[in-house]
């Protein structure tokens, strides 16, 4: 067992100490905190009142036969995110005397689940909040759900003729589609479709900005960006639309500088460049009217408020202020009417609203190395290791590590030359690992360690076996090393005395959670509690509401988890609005083109053969088939 160093001297542990330890006061504000019972508390409406004890909520859901792992969606948080986003822009518009307004859209790709998109459309109706589609399937979702004629339907992504025609025909349904030209070859397709259908959509253009971005999504901008028109392509598009008598339909300029803008300076540079492009397009005769600043409004996953990959060095209000002020400064001196401002802030809207709760199935760790008894006539190398072990203290950790490593290597060399017996070599290795364990227990925080000592803690840390699939529920942790806040949702009044990481259910060494938030960085181990016999240990993964549900896969055939939508209720603590049962074994088999009925039939035939050979009785065969049929109906995850 490795004791968390920052806690060794802590005597009177409190829930507030846990909140500080896990950074809850930073990344969780204003939706998550800790109550006096040591449970995570959810405030779905932020500082506007109302709260739920997350542990009591999970217990209530389990009593409804909804077992872990469980994805809990808080509808009030989703609505609150919309209110905060629009409120920030409304304050900025008032502060800077901006002559236009803000009208956002939600990128459907962030979370295509029907209940999520439906709620966003309904909650955003008062602001004419719209949707963004990046494929034909997403366009069909948006067309069916977005029934507000004043809401924007931004059509991005690669487009064939059917995609473009579908968008144009949507105007006949009272929708307001904007087909954004992202590739030069889309221009003739739009012209042809408009002629064939006798109607044109509102047209937008996406510009490749020269502004350099940072972080893992930095490739979204620049000359090598996947989408967007270069300046020559932009000018050619204007002339092609003019020749086709469609320039009057060019209404929107779009740019995008990454899914998570960590540094506000990147946004400022992009806004200045895009603002001037907007002015020039208007000067060339396009009526314009909308400026879509794309996605990128970031989420402070680690609470450090820094320009690192898991954080942002700006607030929501800071973001809105810079967008409004910069575009006003670009347009007004040139006599250009300021545009309606559009953003595709999917990550900032959806990340906070869902919490994945999973249970721990077991725990394993490296046993404390035993120390062999000293005997007369021990080899010098063994005596040296024994002396090193007895002299380890907080002030000589590096020296002790160097000595232990040297003596271990000496023991191996002596054994190879025949100067050390197998028994003595075994003693040397036991003493070496005892030295490592003693050093690991006294090490300070990871950020203070020299490189050669950083692996010691992990070598003695515990592995907690989690009832989930990382590939299904948090794929970005594996794919791009994304950091999400992970912490126990109860026992927070207790001092966590172990350091550990999580292994998931898949038969894959990458199936793990082994990077955890630290202030402005990441750490390989998380402070956790020792498991208690007969008591559950529940862990929450937070801020995963964007992308994780829709990007998860069926690795090892672990399917979707149970999911519920929760809303605060005036007549009680909460109301379960929607329940979506997780995939069963039968569901995932069918997804892989296996026929469950055919599978059962083959097993039935095998049981008949066993009956015929006398290996199985009829009653045993019946019980076997009932068990197999029941297994097909069960969840893919382990039952408690």
Swiss-Prot record:
Look up the record and name the cofactor or cofactors this protein needs: Mg(2+); pyridoxal 5'-phosphate
**Gene3D superfamilies the record matches:** 1.10.287.3440, 1.20.58.930, Alanine racemase, Lyase, Ornithine Decarboxylase, Chain A, domain 1
Q: Which family does it belong to?
A: Belongs to the Orn/Lys/Arg decarboxylase class-II family. SpeA subfamily.
Sites bearing N6-(pyridoxal phosphate)lysine, chain numbering: 109
Specify the pathway: Amine and polyamine biosynthesis; agmatine biosynthesis; agmatine from L-arginine: step 1/1
Spell out the NCBIfam families in the cross-references.
PRK05354.1, speA
Q: Does the keyword Repeat apply?
A: no
Q: Where does substrate bind?
A: 291-301
UniProt cross-references to Pfam families, sorted A to Z: Arg_decarb_HB, Arg_decarbox_C, Orn_Arg_deC_N
Keywords of the record, alphabetical order, are:
Decarboxylase, Lyase, Magnesium, Metal-binding, Polyamine biosynthesis, Pyridoxal phosphate, Spermidine biosynthesis
Read off the InterPro entries from this record: Ala_racemase/Decarboxylase_C, Arg_decarb_HB, Arg_decarbox_C, Arg_decrbxlase, De-COase2_CS, De-COase2_N, De-COase2_pyr-phos_BS, Orn/DAP/Arg_de-COase
Which superkingdom heads the taxonomic lineage of this protein's source?
Bacteria
Keyword DNA repair on entry: no
What exactly does this protein do? Answer: Catalyzes the biosynthesis of agmatine from arginine.
- This protein is called what? Biosynthetic arginine decarboxylase
> Which enzyme type, at the first EC level?
lyase
Molecular function GO labels: arginine decarboxylase activity; metal ion binding
Q: What is its EC number?
A: 4.1.1.19
Which Gene Ontology BP terms does the record give? arginine catabolic process; spermidine biosynthetic process
Q: Which reaction does it catalyse?
A: L-arginine + H(+) = agmatine + CO2
Q: Which CDD domains match?
A: PLPDE_III_ADC
Q: Which organism is it from?
A: Synechococcus sp. (strain RCC307)
